[in-house]
From Swiss-Prot:
Keywords: Chaperone, Periplasm, Protein transport, Signal, Transport. GO terms for cellular component: periplasmic space. Monomer. It is found in: Periplasm. It comes from Methylobacillus flagellatus (strain ATCC 51484 / DSM 6875 / VKM B-1610 / KT). Belongs to the LolA family. PANTHER family: OUTER-MEMBRANE LIPOPROTEIN CARRIER PROTEIN. SUPFAM superfamilies: Prokaryotic lipoproteins and lipoprotein localization factors. It holds the Pfam family LolA. InterPro entries: LolA/LolB/LppX, OM_lipoprot_carrier_LolA-like, OM_lipoprot_carrier_LolA_Pbac. Residues 1-21 form the signal peptide. This is Outer-membrane lipoprotein carrier protein. The gene is lolA.
Length: 205
């Protein structure tokens, strides 16, 4: 076992720097080449023991800087919309809407990595993670202490985002798989404008 651990470490150290840098370089290339994105997503949440506690599907759209929309469709409906100034989280079943200023909602959140400005290193410490799945992985650790999560991992094929993983302090892992991805589509501004439903219970600023 000790020999295997040492051998693994030696192999890791022998990987060329250009290969080990792929994750962060792919993240930076994504920022440069992708100003808008539309995709279907499948999201699975596991607990600290690896048990699946949630699985949902939906569609997402983003347009930098600061505009995004996540529509959860299965097994329940929920909407998260960022219009560049505020973030709106709506639960139709409860008819409840939570509103937060964009600066407080995504400064050091996973959303800021995708829809925020290109200077991710201002809010995150970026490193490359090596995995055997054929993707280039970048790890982003928030510099703010109150971000609500420990790290985000983003898996790329070239400069195209394929997967995301969110790890929180309780050991929960949220894995997001993207498919039917469109890069730089024309997205109407109305997609990021949230209209408050009649009678909704509004919470927040």
């Amino acid at each position: 076992m000790r020999f295997l651990a040492v051998a693994t470490m030696v192999v890791a150290l022998m990987v060329p720097w250009s290969v080990r840098a792929d994750g962060v370089e792919s993240l930076k290339a994504f920022f440069k080449s992708t100003s808008a994105m539309r995709a279907h997503f499948r999201q699975v949440v596991t607990d600290a023991q690896g048990n699946k506690v949630q699985e949902v599907e939906g569609h997402m759209q983003l347009q930098r800087p600061g505009k995004f929309r996540w529509d959860y469709n299965k097994p329940y409906v929920q909407q998260i919309v960022g219009d560049g100034e505020k973030v709106w989280l709506y639960d139709p079943d409860l008819n409840q809407l939570t509103v937060r200023p964009m600066s407080k909602a995504i400064g050091s959140s996973p959303a800021s990595l995708l829809a925020g400005a290109q200077d991710a290193e201002r809010n995150f410490t970026l490193t490359t993670v090596i995995r055997s799945d054929g993707l280039a992985w970048a790890q982003a650790v928030p510099k703010a202490e109150d971000s609500g999560f420990d790290k985000v991992l983003l898996g790329f094929k070239g400069d195209e985002l394929q997967k995301m993983e969110l790890h929180d302090s309780f050991g929960h892992v949220t894995s997001i798989q993207f498919s039917q991805l469109q890069r730089n589509p024309a997205i109407a501004n109305s997609s990021f404008q949230f209209v408050v439903p009649a009678g909704a219970d509004v919470v927040g600023e």
